[in-house]
Amino acid sequence: MTRVIGIDPGTVSVDLCGLDDGALFLDRSFPTAEALADPAAFVALLERAAPLDLIAGPSGYGLPVTPAARATEEDLRLAFLAAEGEAGGIGGLRPLARALARSALPVVFTPGVIHLASVPEHRKVNRVDMGTADKVCAAALAIDEQARGTNRPVHKVSLVLLELGGAFTAGLAVEGGRILDGIGGTAGPLGFRSAGALDGEVAFLAGTVPKSLLFGGGAAAVAGWDDADASPERFEHPTADRKSVV
């Protein structure tokens, strides 16, 4: 039997899912700011779920499968691509990753789309965000569910996975059970909070492109909402022309 936990560090929430031989034993969700404010408390929560065989840690843009205890500072820089103290984006992920690495928990960092050998090299040129590590995990789940639901082998599964998150919209292409391409949230279409791919001239006019810029300018901003009252459900009943445009 295998006892595992997956950590999904989203813009709005950090979610935990634990499976014991396929049966759910942990399903928790925390506001992101709250979860990352105290890495030690978060680690303690995971330790209470022991014994564990594996934890899929918060991996950002991903790394080749790497035990957290062996991850270097350069690995963490590449996985999270944010300067120390950067206020924009998901602040606190790197300190959490360090805390997990210092623990005795069996944490591994997992790959993003760009790390996959199944993705042709020419598609990776001048790309970074082809899909974060959590998107790869979502695609793996979709492939498995599609195979089981249609009673066909994995190599017969082809699909397009679209994920509409709290900030970003991303898409992954699967053919023959393998991820072949992806468009990550910062390179894709408009998201709920994120503007998605930026026109090069927009980036030029911005002057600088801090991490916070990647997390703004989305559908909620077009609708004129601030972060406190932003909710996708509000689009069901638009009350102004601007909301109708979105």
Where are these regions (language model features)?
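Glycine-rich, mobile lid/loop segments that gate access to catalytic sites or pores
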Residues: 113, 119, 126, 130, ...
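Gly/Thr-rich phosphate-binding beta-strand-loop-beta motif of the actin/hexokinase/Hsp70
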Residues: 1-27, 58, 157-182
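Glycine-rich beta-alpha junction loops
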Residues: 59-62, 114, 165-168, 185-190, ...
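Conserved active-site and cofactor/substrate-binding residues in soluble primary-metabolism enzymes
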Residues: 11, 91, 95, 133-137, ...
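Glycine-rich phosphate-binding loop plus the immediately following alpha-helix
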Residues: 124, 128-155, 176-234
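Short beta-strand-loop/turn "lid" adjacent to the catalytic site in phosphate-handling enzymes
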Residues: 51-127
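Nucleic-acid-processing active sites and adjacent nucleic-acid-binding tracks
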Residues: 25-46
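Conserved small/polar residues in nucleotide/adenosyl-binding loops
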Residues: 243-245
